[in-house]
Every structure is written in structure tokens, then in C-alpha cells.
A protein has these predicted regions:
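Alpha-helical hydrophobic helix detector
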Residues: 19-36
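Periplasmic/extracellular, small/polar-rich flexible segments of pilin-like filament-forming proteins
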Residues: 65-136
Length: 136
């Protein structure tokens, strides 16, 4: 009796349909995740700017205690903006030396960055914080 030698050939790859299904699933997940990621980056950059503005305001108060005037810029306070802030915001100082002396520090989003839609952030000598027209 002779046995037939039949070999089974197994497929060791993926079919085109299986690959297309995986690509479609990955694309759907990316469409869901990207807006959340963008919001995460926006909030992170805003948080960095808020923290920097708080640091400046605190140093302004210390500077005022020593010199009875507010510093006109961050250089006088020996401060440098963190990279996240430098890349996304322009920080400006408005100092009024008339009695009583006041300051307003504003971080305005740079054009061409994600932060443009976020609006300016500011803090004054009383500690009042503004985000556009709202408080932080």
C-alpha cells in the first residue's frame, strides 16, 4: 500500500484585507486621539506660561521691596523665560511708577503657534490674573 505524501502549505503572512482592517482601525484611533493630544499640548504650554508669570510677579514684589520700584523687564529680575514660554509667547511688562506704582505682565501668544487660539494671559501687582477676558 502506497501512502500519498500530501503536504499542507500554511500561510505565514497577512492578507491584504487583514492589513487594510488594521490600517482603518489605527486611522480611527488617530482621529480620536489627535484632538485630545492637541488640547493636552495647549494646556501644558498655558500652564508653563502661567507659572512663569507667577514667578515674575513674585520677583517683582521682591524687587519692589528692595528698590521701591518695579523692574521694567525680566532682565532686571535676572529671569529667563523657559523654552516652552519663549517658543509660544511674547512676554511684555507695563510698569507705571506714578503713586501707587503698578505693573501688568502679559504673555501674548505668538502667531503661527497653537496658543493663538488660547488668548493672552496677564497678572498685575495685586495678583489679579486674566486669561483673555476671564480669570485663570
Amino acid at each position: 500500500m502506497k501512502l500519498l505524501n500530501v503536504r499542507r502549505h500554511s500561510s505565514n503572512g497577512f492578507t491584504l484585507i487583514e492589513l487594510m482592517i488594521v490600517v482603518a482601525i489605527v486611522a480611527a484611533l488617530a482621529m480620536i486621539a489627535y484632538p485630545s493630544y492637541s488640547q493636552f499640548i495647549l494646556k501644558g504650554n498655558r500652564g508653563a506660561a502661567q507659572s512663569y508669570l507667577m514667578d515674575i510677579a513674585q520677583r517683582q514684589q521682591l524687587f519692589f521691596n528692595d528698590s521701591r520700584t518695579f523692574a521694567p523687564d525680566a532682565n532686571q529680575l535676572n529671569m529667563t523665560a523657559p523654552e516652552r514660554v519663549q517658543d509660544n509667547y511674547t512676554v511684555s511688562f507695563a510698569v507705571d511708577l506714578n503713586a501707587p506704582p503698578t505693573f501688568l505682565i502679559t504673555a501674548t501668544p505668538k502667531s503661527g503657534t497653537r496658543q493663538v487660539s488660547d488668548g493672552p494671559l496677564s497678572i498685575d501687582n495685586t495678583g489679579e490674573k486674566l486669561h483673555g477676558v476671564e480669570s485663570w
